[in-house]
Amino acid sequence: MKRRQKRKHLEIEESKEAGISKSQEDISHPESTGVPKAQSPGVGEVSSASEYFSCVSSPQKLIHRSKGTWKLLQDSSKPRSPLDQVPEGEATTAPSQQASSSCPSYKTCVSSLCMNKEERGMKIYYMQVQMKKGVAISWDTKETSESLEKQPRMEEATLPEGVWVGTPPSDVSTRNLLSDSEPIGEEKEHEEKPESDSPPGSPAVEERPRAKTPDWLVTMENGFRCMACCRVFATMESLQEHVQYGIREGFSCHVFHLTMAQLIGSMESESTQEEEEDHTEETEKPKEEKAEEQQPTEEDVGMKKPWSQCPGCVFDSPKDRRRRKDHCDNSGS
């Protein structure tokens, strides 16, 4: 009896262990339940299938790439057996290739849109001036006293596309634009002190190179004055270069010319609206005057009476005159 009980106990334990092992095998092999096996990405793959579908803008681009990707999309909605699996080479390499080709194209599209927004024409506002003793006067005047009385004539020129170079001045500080090699503050003082200690007649001081004067400080007879910083430039090209690459000098007149163009554009739009309103008022006035003239004439016609209704002492109708003549003739005869 004891041996039988032991055998039954052992058989029950063996059956339990067999059931646990079967459940583990079912979990480790999902092909028997119809769930497709998850494929780990290879070494050369760029991204997984989820990243691939997030990058592609439309599913039509996915279909014509390869037959393996079409099979993958077609069979993903249906449970498949281990025999119907798509080969790993087709199912894994095609999404990675498409992901690597679609993501950079998306980035290039966005950058091209930003460049198109930045690359716009721009108006530069300047004034042609003459220089007399280092003072800029108006172009048309001969004396400085007359230039103060006359209003300066401002002109404009349009820069070609691609005006702005680099980042806008609001996002860039002047200190960051300066070179790191340039000494600042105390370093300049320490460098200048040993040079100043040398006697004035020494050859070291004589051989020291002099700084080149900038072009805008050179005396000139006439030029073009920037309306933002009032600097005079010899040629129109130098003025355009100043507005275009002014950030290199530590400041820029770019914002001034943009706001000036906006203000002038708004003023022109307001003036055109006022002119249109005045034109409509002028066209409506003669119509109203004609209508007023027609109204009293109609009233006068209504107020007139025929000859028969008028009193005889004032007006005589032609019929009454004939009757009187006939009556006089009959009485005379």
Swiss-Prot record:
GO CC list: nucleus
Q: Where would you say this protein principally sits, based on its record?
A: nucleus
Q: For the region Disordered, give the residue spans.
A: 1-45, 73-107, 143-214, 267-333
Q: Which UniProt keywords apply?
A: Activator, DNA-binding, Metal-binding, Nucleus, Phosphoprotein, Transcription, Transcription regulation, Zinc, Zinc-finger
Q: Where is the composition biased (Acidic residues)?
A: 271-281
- Could you tell me which residues carry Phosphoserine? 308
Feature: compositional bias, Polar residues: 170-179
Q: Which GO terms describe its molecular function?
A: DNA binding; zinc ion binding
Zinc finger (C2H2-type) residue ranges?
Answer: 224-248
Q: To which protein family does this belong?
A: Belongs to the FAM170 family.
Q: What is known of its domains?
A: The N-terminus is necessary for nuclear localization. The C-terminus is necessary for transcriptional activity.
Q: What is this protein for, i.e. what is its function?
A: Acts as a nuclear transcription factor that positively regulates the expression of heat shock genes. Binds to heat shock promoter elements (HSE).
Task: Supply the name of the protein.
Answer: Protein FAM170A
